[in-house]
Amino acid sequence: MAEFPASLLILNGKSTDNLPLREAIMLLREEGMTIHVRVTWEKGDAARYVEEARKLGVATVIAGGGDGTINEVSTALIQCEGDDIPALGILPLGTANDFATSVGIPEALDKALKLAIAGDAIAIDMAQVNKQTCFINMATGGFGTRITTETPEKLKAALGSVSYIIHGLMRMDTLQPDRCEIRGENFHWQGDALVIGIGNGRQAGGGQQLCPNALINDGLLQLRIFTGDEILPALVSTLKSDEDNPNIIEGASSWFDIQAPHDITFNLDGEPLSGQNFHIEILPAALRCRLPPDCPLLR
């Protein structure tokens, strides 16, 4: 087979007992591919391993985990300076794998690993919040964010994305919409938001298409707001088609400013960030990512 440059796999510590993954790595090594493996146990590990990857001269750093792991690795990559910055490869091993699913990464580990090593590296956008925190997929706010951040880890491990629905139903009586004001390029809205989705990618929360028109290389963020004064009626209205739904507000901009009279929480690729003021902007062509040729999120 053709020779490929070396890669470094940054593996979330929760996936170390994945026997099929070990077998896939061993098989590719036997075929002549050089794959270094490092395991993360705490925040900051991914950034250190990206630095090591640059010293090793690898062509690809593979994020092995869920959306949070992809976020950590991609954030570390865009902070690199100089030439020969490795491309991002994706190996979906998390609970929801929203970004990997939406860009078309294969579910089979061996196929995903080969794509992460040998796929075409395409320049894609990332987003940044308040000039600090980044996300590659989506920022979600509202009651859905509170559900995903509060759902017990054991429930997520046992039931996957279904756990979010169960926990949400259990909390229905305590959840309230968030009052806020959102501005962007040729966009202004103020009111009660049930759910806010600001997407570089399209889906979050285990497959929910919050921003179905988003592309990862168009220099824009897609905004979708589900509005409503009461949770249950607004939830029922989301079952209608988009054209018939007065509770859906949409917009597109390279930046959005969000202000609220009280603290609201956004979920950035799985990591919560709370505050009253948010400036979210796109970072065009921030990194290269190895993607399938038919990736639906490319223009």
UniProtKB/Swiss-Prot annotation:
It comes from the Bacteria. It is found in: Cytoplasm. Binds 1 Mg(2+) ion per subunit. Ca(2+) may be able to substitute. Its cofactor is Mg(2+); Ca(2+). Mg(2+) binds at residues 215, 218, 220. Keywords: ATP-binding, Cytoplasm, Kinase, Lipid biosynthesis, Lipid metabolism, Magnesium, Metal-binding, Nucleotide-binding, Phospholipid biosynthesis, Phospholipid metabolism, Transferase. One of its GO terms (biological process) is phospholipid biosynthetic process. Transmembrane segments: none annotated. The active site is at 271 (proton acceptor). GO terms for molecular function: ATP binding; lipid kinase activity; magnesium ion binding. SMART domains: DAGKc (SM00046). Residues 2-133 form the DAGKc domain. Its main location: cytoplasm. Probably phosphorylates lipids; the in vivo substrate is unknown. This is Probable lipid kinase YegS. The lineage of its organism: Bacteria, Pseudomonadati, Pseudomonadota, Gammaproteobacteria, Enterobacterales.
